[in-house]
Amino acid sequence: MSFGRHALIGLLAAMPSMALAQPCTGVVYLTFDTGNMRHAESIAGTLRKHDVKATFFLANEKTARGDYSLDAAWAGYWKELAAEGHAFGSHTWRHGRIGPDAADGAVKYRPSFGQDEGRTVTLSSQDFCAELKRPGAAFREYTGRTLDALWRAPGGNATPGALKTAQRCGYAHVQWAPAGFLGDELPSETHSNEALLAQALRNVRDGDVLMAHLGIWSRRDPFAPMIDPLVAGLKQRGFCFRTLRDHPGYRAEQPPITLAASRSR
């Protein structure tokens, strides 16, 4: 990478206050799927640095430190993010790939973790609803609040039947915009961080939903350090960041939010 590009990334990352001074000419929605959580803390720090709220989609995924992302050991992390005003949706409990639609509203599902790992199973509509709701049960135990009525299928692959079943359970599916695919799961040998950053800064448009992970197994050179210059650069372009609670397509989907902390204020 050239010195000039290094300098640009460093300049963007170091200028949160100047970015905040820019007028808001558009809105983007930054979202994160759990992944292996290797960069969860650093990403949370970047969001605090820039005073940006994001939306997190939670699955109980195996982490880089050997536990699972919704184990009690992560309770403090989720509680802190909830207190900071971020939004949260379901990414299914076992991070399962959704297969072709089955009969009678059933969903074919291949869990990545836990029971039936690596096997395609058929979940009844009731069981699929339970799979969607289970991350919320852990989240509520740790934070005192509910998940927002949103979900994202692992890989973004949701069939018409799964979408319909989830909707009956009260969940709206959230896909990302084409320009919002930040590419953090692509091979770094062919998709450098600098190229992915430049592509996002060039192509993201008003209303786009952006997607990355809190850690990913499939990339050697992690993209997480680019979140800092990405946020700064988009602010320099005049974008404001909002959670999906403020997205016009999902606003009506939200149930009442219960925060244990709010009762003590």
What spans do the regions from the language model cover?
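Bacterial N-terminal signal peptides that target proteins for export
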Residues: 1-8
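N-terminal signal peptide c-region/cleavage motif recognized by signal peptidases
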Residues: 14-17
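Hydrophobic residues in well-ordered beta-strands that form the structural core
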Residues: 56, 88-90, 175, 212, ...
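C-terminal domain-boundary segment and adjacent tail
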Residues: 22, 54, 64, 219-265
